[in-house]
Amino acid sequence: MTYLAAAIQMSSGPDKAANLEKAERLIRLAAARGARMVALPEVFNWRGKRAEEPAAAESLEGETLTLMGRLARELEINLLAGSITEHAPGQAKRYNTSVLFGPDGRSLAAYH
C-alpha cells in the first residue's frame, strides 16, 4: 500500500483572497495527483507588514480555516493548514497557529 503526501510551497503576499485562491488551486492539484495528505506552508494565507497583522489575523472559525476544512472534506484528504495568524477572541495576543484537518473536514489538532 502506498500513501502519497504533498508539501505545497507558495509565496504569499498581502492579498489574502489571492493567496487563498492560489492555495485552493494547489491543494486541488495535489489531490488530483493522488495526494492523501497535503501540507501548506507557514503564513500561507497572508504575509505582509507587521503593522497590518492585527487586521489580517483570524479566529479558528474564520474564512481561511473554514475553507481548509471544506476542502479537506470535499477532497477526502488530510490537510495541514501550515499556519495563520490567529486572533483569539477576547485577547489582544496573536498566535502563529497550524491546524490539521481530517478527510471528514473536522479539525484533528491545532498548534498555537
Question: Each predicted region: which residue ranges?
Answer:
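Extreme N-terminal starter segment of soluble prokaryotic enzymes
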Residues: 1-6
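Short polar catalytic/cofactor-binding loops
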Residues: 9-14
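Cys-nucleophile CN-hydrolase/nitrilase-fold catalytic domain and related Cys-dependent amidase chemistry
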Residues: 16, 25-104, 108-112
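Substrate/cofactor-recognition hotspot
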Residues: 19
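PLP-dependent aminotransferase-class I/II
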Residues: 22
